[in-house]
Regions:
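N-terminal helix-turn-helix
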Residues: 1-79
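Amphipathic alpha-helical effector-binding/dimerization core
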Residues: 65-145
Length: 145
């Protein structure tokens, strides 16, 4: 049993986390079964998320993450203001243009990549904004620890 003040919100985040972690879109029945939630609660939460475009439902009745999440991500970036500063600083120091440089933050034991300047080299790593990696498994995370 949940000790949260708002159990429905906890269920909502469980659903969103499951959809996010899945390699494929999921049906409502699968979500309810996997999370051991009542089907009616699952249905109601999914409908609420659909109306806000936090998720969308394809023609086969499967659920995907929706476009509204990009709005939140954009607003987060604006409020933090550090991504533009990061880009400006990269341009001020030309030596950095030759290297892959990431802007990251630590969040609950994970490194979250906020922005990346990629080296012009043909081979290298690509870091996408929003990707989370356990801190102990990345050089960036180890440096932060």
């Amino acid at each position: 049993m949940s000790t949260s003040a708002v159990p429905a919100l906890d269920k909502t985040f469980q659903i969103l986390d499951l959809i996010t972690a899945s390699q494929q879109p999921l049906t409502a029945a699968y979500i309810a079964k996997e999370l051991k939630l009542p089907r009616s609660s699952t249905h109601n939460i999914l409908q609420s998320l659909l109306t806000k475009h936090v998720i969308y439902k394809d023609s086969e009745g499967r659920f995907h993450l929706g476009s509204y999440l990009l709005y939140w991500a954009g607003k987060y970036e604006q409020q933090q203001g550090v991504v533009q500063l990061f880009k400006d600083l990269i341009m001020q120091y030309p030596i950095l243009l030759q290297h892959t440089v990431t802007l990251s933050k630590m969040d609950l034991g994970e490194v979250v990549f906020l922005a990346c300047h990629e080296a012009p080299a043909p081979l290298g790593f690509t870091f996408r904004a929003g990707v989370r990696v356990p801190a102990v498994f990345s050089a960036t995370g180890k440096a932060m620890l």
